[in-house]
Structure formats: C-alpha cells, structure tokens
C-alpha cells in the first residue's frame, strides 16, 4: 500500500553524496555523512532530512568515539525514522564499506506514525537505488548490539564493525 508521501530532493542528494565515493580532498572527506536520519515533514507529505541528526566522517575520532553507538542514540524512542548508515567493516578477506538502509519503528511510536512510515518505505527505497543491506528494528535491543548490523552485512564472515571486534 502506497501512502502518497513524496521523497524530497534533499534526501536523494544526501543519498547520492553518501553512495558515490569519488576521490576527494581530506577536507571534503571530513564533510561526508557517515549517518543520517530522515523523517516525515510536519504535514506528513514528504520524507525529509532531519535537521541536526547526522554524523560526519570528520566527527569520527574527534567528537564521536564510536559512530555506531552514537547513531543508535540518535534514534527517537517514541517515533519512527528512516536512516542511512555508512558501515565500515572487515571480513576475514577484506575491509569494506556499505550503505545500510534502516527502518526504525519503535514499539512506543504512535500507531498512525508506524502505519505512515511502513506504507512509505517502498517509496524511499525506490529512490535510494543500489542499497544492498536493509535493517528493520522495533526496539533498542535489536540495534544496540553491533552484531545485528554485522549479521546483515555478511553474517559470521564479519569480524569487526567500525574498527571494533565482534
């Protein structure tokens, strides 16, 4: 079921900026987004970038010690969100980076919010082409342990996430 909610151009631009890893100056790399949250506009007609809810690559190691833990803390406990997380992980063979689409629908969110977000998920996923990994979570227990994300990225082959061993 489609909800009629549109995806704003800003969301698509952020996604394309995160997806394309072109050679950049160190200053440009620091400004790349590591994680972002998307929410519904106040009139519930558009999916937009949530202001102030992002982690920049340049923040990691400076103001952000563990980007994954910081990201989990950004998720609201009483409302739904969509998120993009640029995961850096290691398998037994190599180091990898992949974008993960996350649908956050906590149990404490209002039913109407859960319904709108659930029915709009396909609209945003169609615009974010090339996403290999998706995670849906309904409580902090499901996301606070980095093993849940590692499982989505490659299961037992993943040995570390964000430089932290599993």
From Swiss-Prot:
A motif (Nuclear localization signal) lies at residues 30-34. The modification Phosphoserine is found at residues 3, 8, 41, 156. Pfam families: Cofilin_ADF. Can bind G- and F-actin in a 1:1 ratio of cofilin to actin. It is a major component of intranuclear and cytoplasmic actin rods. Interacts with the subcortical maternal complex (SCMC) via interaction with TLE6 and NLRP5. Interacts with C9orf72. The modification N-acetylalanine is found at residue 2. GO terms for biological process: actin filament depolymerization; actin filament fragmentation; actin filament organization; cell motility; cell projection organization; cellular response to epidermal growth factor stimulus; cellular response to ether; cellular response to hydrogen peroxide. GO terms for cellular component: cell-cell junction; cofilin-actin rod; cortical actin cytoskeleton; cytoplasm; cytosol; dendritic spine; extracellular region; filopodium. Inactivated by phosphorylation on Ser-3. Phosphorylated on Ser-3 in resting cells. Dephosphorylated by PDXP/chronophin; this restores its activity in promoting actin filament depolymerization. The phosphorylation of Ser-24 may prevent recognition of the nuclear localization signal. Phosphorylated via a ARRB1-RAC1-LIMK1-PAK1 cascade upon active ligand stimulation of atypical chemokine receptor ACKR2. InterPro entries: ADF-H, ADF-H/Gelsolin-like_dom_sf, ADF/Cofilin. It is a peripheral membrane protein. This is Cofilin-1. Widely distributed in various tissues. Not found in skeletal muscle. Keywords: Acetylation, Actin-binding, Cell membrane, Cell projection, Cytoplasm, Cytoskeleton, Isopeptide bond, Membrane, Nucleus, Phosphoprotein, Ubl conjugation. Belongs to the actin-binding proteins ADF family. It comes from the Eukaryota. There is a cross-link at residue 132 (Glycyl lysine isopeptide (Lys-Gly) (interchain with G-Cter in SUMO2)). The modification Phosphothreonine is found at residues 25, 63. Binds to F-actin and exhibits pH-sensitive F-actin depolymerizing activity. In conjunction with the subcortical maternal complex (SCMC), plays an essential role for zygotes to progress beyond the first embryonic cell divisions via regulation of actin dynamics. Required for the centralization of the mitotic spindle and symmetric division of zygotes. Plays a role in the regulation of cell morphology and cytoskeletal organization in epithelial cells. SMART domains: ADF. The modification Phosphotyrosine is found at residues 68, 82, 140. The gene is Cfl1. One of its GO terms (molecular function) is signaling receptor binding.
């Amino acid at each position: 079921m489609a909800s009629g909610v549109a995806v704003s151009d800003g969301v698509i631009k952020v996604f394309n900026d995160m997806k394309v890893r072109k050679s950049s100056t160190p200053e440009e790399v620091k400004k790349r987004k590591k994680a972002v949250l998307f929410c519904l506009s106040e009139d519930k007609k558009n999916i937009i970038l949530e202001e102030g809810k992002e982690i920049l690559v340049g923040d990691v190691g400076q103001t952000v010690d563990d980007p994954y833990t910081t990201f989990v803390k950004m998720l609201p406990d009483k409302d739904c969100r969509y998120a993009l997380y640029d995961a850096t992980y290691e398998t037994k063979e190599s180091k990898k980076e992949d974008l993960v689409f996350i649908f956050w629908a906590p149990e404490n969110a209002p039913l109407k919010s859960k319904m709108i977000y659930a029915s709009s998920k396909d609209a945003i996923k169609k615009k974010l082409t090339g996403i290999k990994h998706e995670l849906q979570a309904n409580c902090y227990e499901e996301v606070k342990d980095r093993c849940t994300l590692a499982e989505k990225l490659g299961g037992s082959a993943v040995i570390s996430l964000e430089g932290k061993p599993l």
